[in-house]
């Protein structure tokens, strides 16, 4: 009888420890900022991401890089993704979300924050990201005029050793039109958590505005953590 009672006590203690650990992990995850980095090609968001990583030590995740890395790994999933892309098809949002979720899960224990670069590209992707992974704390939209982006893309293409058939003004403007339509829907839905930044200024001036926004997010996180203690 005493042995069975002891077992019940041990089991209850183990369950309480497990619940405490789950609560600790949930609070830790909630304390890690997630920031969406939005902007058209040539807007300079890559430069700003590098500066954010240098200052804050955040983890920079690009959906494109994750796809390429998975293909390069030679895994079963990588071979499946390669087959889809080689056929000219689009990788499903479920696959992209799965890669993002895996990357966030792997880095969550040591990361100070996450920059999700170039995602979401469509409104439904943002909705699914927040439902399946976590709510974004902030969306930074680096706004650039179409003419400026065209000039930057074409200059970058001219300097590249690899030439692409679609690096012409007509095709670029068509891509930018699609981007603008999709982005407008995202900005409308997530307006309360979005900061639109004029990306046609000096890099350091842009970064000052970025820093103010991120510092505000971090301050709120700290206040929430203190309130839970």
Curated annotation (Swiss-Prot):
GO cellular component, one term: nucleus
InterPro entries assigned to the protein according to its UniProt record, in alphabetical order: Adenylat/UMP-CMP_kin, Adenylat_kinase_CS, AK1/5, P-loop_NTPase
Any GO BP annotation: nucleobase-containing compound metabolic process
Binding positions (ATP): 42-47, 156
Gene that encodes the chain: Ak1
GO MF term (any one): ATP binding
Tissues where this protein is expressed: High expression levels in the thorax, suggesting a possible function in the gastrointestinal or reproductive systems.
Knockout or disruption consequences: RNAi-mediated knockdown has no effect on viability.
The UniProt record lists the keyword Transferase: yes
Family the entry assigns: Belongs to the adenylate kinase family. AK1 subfamily.
Disulfide bonds: none
Protein name (database record): Adenylate kinase 1
Keyword Nucleotide-binding part of the UniProt annotation: yes
Pfam name, any one: ADK
NCBIfam families: aden_kin_iso1 (TIGR01360)
Organismal lineage: Eukaryota, Metazoa, Ecdysozoa, Arthropoda, Hexapoda
Task performed by this protein: Catalyzes the reversible transfer of the terminal phosphate group between ATP and AMP. Plays an important role in cellular energy homeostasis and in adenine nucleotide metabolism.
Chief location of this protein within or outside the cell: cytoplasm
Protein origin, superkingdom: Eukaryota
Keyword entries, A-Z: ATP-binding, Cytoplasm, Kinase, Nucleotide-binding, Phosphoprotein, Transferase
């Amino acid at each position: 009888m005493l042995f069975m009672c002891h077992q019940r006590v041990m089991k209850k203690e183990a369950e309480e420890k497990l619940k405490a650990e789950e609560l600790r992990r949930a609070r830790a995850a909630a304390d890690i900022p997630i920031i969406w980095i939005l902007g058209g090609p040539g807007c300079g968001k890559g430069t700003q991401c590098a500066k954010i990583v240098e200052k804050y030590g955040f983890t920079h995740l690009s959906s494109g890089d994750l796809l390429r890395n998975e293909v390069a790994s030679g895994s079963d999933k990588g071979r499946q993704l390669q087959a889809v892309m080689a056929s000219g098809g689009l990788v499903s949002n479920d696959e992209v979300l799965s890669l993002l979720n895996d990357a966030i899960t792997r880095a969550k224990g040591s990361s100070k924050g996450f920059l999700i670069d170039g995602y979401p590209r469509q409104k439904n992707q943002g909705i699914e990201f927040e439902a399946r992974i976590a709510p974004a704390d902030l969306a930074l939209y680096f706004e650039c005029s179409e003419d400026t982006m065209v000039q930057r893309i074409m200059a970058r293409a001219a300097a590249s050793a690899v030439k692409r058939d679609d690096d012409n003004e007509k095709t670029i403007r068509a891509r930018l039109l699609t981007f603008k339509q999709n982005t407008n829907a995202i900005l409308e839905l997530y307006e309360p958590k979005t900061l639109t930044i004029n990306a046609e200024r000096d890099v350091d001036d842009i970064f000052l505005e970025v820093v103010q926004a991120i510092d505000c997010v971090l301050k709120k996180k700290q206040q929430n953590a203190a309130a839970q203690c």
